[in-house]
Amino acid sequence: KSQRFYTFKTTDILSPSLLVYKGEKEWTILRDKSKKANHIIIGPQTFFSAAIPLINHREKTLYASLDKIYEEFSAGNKDPIGIRHFLQWTQENWEQKPMTVFLLGDADFDYRNITGKSKIVVPTIEVGTNYTYATDDRLSAFNGIIPEMATGRFPARTEQEVSDFIEKLISFETNMPTGIWKQRVTLVADDPARPEREPYELFIGRSHTKNSERLAMSIPDYMDIEKLYMVDFPEKKDASTFGVTKPEATQALFNQLSQGTAFINYIGHGNPTQWAQEKLLIISDERNDLSLIKTNMKLPIWIAGTCNWGQFDNIDRESFAEKLIRTPMDGASAIITTNRGITVSSNIQFLEKIFNEIFRGDSITTKNLGTVIQSIKTGGSDGEIFHLFGDPAMRLPIPKSLISDGKVSPDTLETLEVGTLIAKSPIESGSGIIVFEDGPSEVTRSFNYASKEEKITYLQKGPTLFNGSFTFTNSTFSPQFRVPKDITYSKNPAKVRFTINDGLNDEAIGSVSEIYLSLGSPSNDVEGPIITFESESGLLLKDGDILPTNQNLIIRVSDPMGINLTGEKGHELFINNSLTGETINAIEQFVYDDNSINTGTIIFNVSSNLDNLSLIISAWDNANNPTEAEIQLVLLKSNKLDMLRILNFPNPFSDETQFTFELTKDAKISINIYTISGRKVKSIIERNQKLGFNRISWNGRDEYGNLLANGVYLYKIKAEINNQKINHIGRLAIYR
């Protein structure tokens, strides 16, 4: 080893000339043994005010400022080991030991700021020399390298980011949207075709899909497993972008996030800003997928078994995971991912442990998210590089109450037959959602690898046969559903999943498996569904009507045999926008009305960028009879009160005429009738009218009930709402 020597004269050594006793420091803030807390938040004092709502939201939560930690546990030095000493003190001395610790601040590898570029808020611990990685586990590993507290981090850089995240988290936990999305796990697998090139590397490409299938085996029947495997999607080569992309896979991912999913798990290649070489998700100068992720506050927990996607300790670059968790009121509730590279085997082993810990046989864990992750950490480096971005005290979105005594009658169903789900409820009364799903089928996909065709086989989820809602009382429920003519005749049985809630806080979920389907008698029905269009306010719409862009269009589809939702080729539920050329399959958006097996709706989001809307809807009933309907609407962008298409009909009239008009918003309407000379002869009493088309009748009589003489008259219609007023003057004629 090389050695370094220093030489100096003894006279160069300085000696203190005076020592003055200043007294002893009383450590009374954090070294108070009477402290009690379940949850600790660690961050700078500047973040304290922003953290107060979370402190109040959580039970027994203490905010420990970094300044106090450094002062009491590392002699004032900004040393991450001071954080560990503090946390160890809480475990050994506090009256109540905290279980979780939330690190409120970003970090990088340079806590001593040797580079001069460090912007650390709350430091992490860097492990290793040649191969290094960041881990927060070591901050709570007091007797070795296994963490003894559940740890999570929000990589905040500013007080505003803290406020935004805490607002999102509290809103999510206190106003979590109900629905079947809480029973959904979305498994995403990278394409097996690239970037591996050598024949011996083929197993790596295959492993993404194979290990996702392995993970699916850890997930119970009462959960809905959506599979988004990139091998299913077509390749696109565009000269404007380098390499092969799969834009349909990206759009399918966005659609799934919009519909809602409790967990989204990715297995495949990645880097700090990208999933898959085909750019399934990416942040770059040319493309920012983060801005396209819309969850409608059905915030998923993201689990990414890939390389470096959560590399938060890089001084020069922010990772996708950091930006995603910071997204205000959208994006993610929490993220579990790696900050360095990981092997195929270590990856699937850790992911399996996560799901095995959440789903324990016939029960769902009651642990918070941080404790779930802590409980599967063993001190190995593969586990240490998996980080939790988010509050470790956050509860899982899956309802904890399971209903296991449900049954379907009859247990073998024929096509076009009606089945009934019968179950007892832990909730006295409320509403629920039922989904009837065909059995999965084995499929084989081909892909090109090293100029050779390869194949991969997996189980494809069965199509949805029914998706409806119901209400119940007296702690029992018995919703019905119909079997369509289109079934896959899979060798695997069908299943029913359901969720119920009381409209407040109580929820329960369950499923019934082993439902067998067979071919039934043919139907005499030859009529297709009836398709109508409505505004959100319930107004029936027809061609040429007005719809404000701040309202959704309701598409109602009805048929005595029910609506075909299987998605079988040629029998899809399509919405075609003839102005944009876009066609979407609306099967996932269709939901039956409460307690109905005949009628349901699709909520169509209207773009505020368009002036007109032209849609063609095609639908099939369960007996495979088709219908097509078309509508053209004028889209109103302004929120200003206006009256359009005002006329009276018939005109001239003898006994009665109708004043018709369209309103751009609800308003109070009055109509006055005048002679040509301006004398008022009739006032029609003010009445409230709804947005859209309206009509008011008049019998041609004056205020005293007398018939008015033949001739020309003027009418004045006034619309008023709040401080907005509008008038219209027109002519009418009476002729008898």
What does each of the following model-derived ranges do?
Residues 1-469, 473-482, 487-492, 497-519, ...:
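Cysteine-dependent hydrolase recognition
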Residues 388-422, 518-551, 558, 636-652:
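Short, compositionally biased P/S/T/A/G/V-rich stretches that sit at domain boundaries
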Residues 420-426, 552-560, 658-664:
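Short edge beta-strand/loop segments characteristic of extracellular beta-sandwich folds
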Residues 435-517, 535-539, 544, 548, ...:
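Long, low-complexity serine/threonine/glycine- and acidic-rich segments characteristic of extracellular
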Residues 493-497, 612-616, 658, 695, ...:
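Short, conserved beta-strand segments of beta-strand-rich sandwich/propeller modules, principally
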Residues 564, 624-628, 680, 705-707, ...:
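A structural signal for beta-strand boundary/capping segments at domain termini and interdomain linkers
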Residues 632, 706-736:
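C-terminal tail/sorting-segment detector
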Residues 632-649, 653-675, 683-687, 695-698, ...:
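Glycine-centered coil/turn sites that cap beta-strands in beta-rich domains
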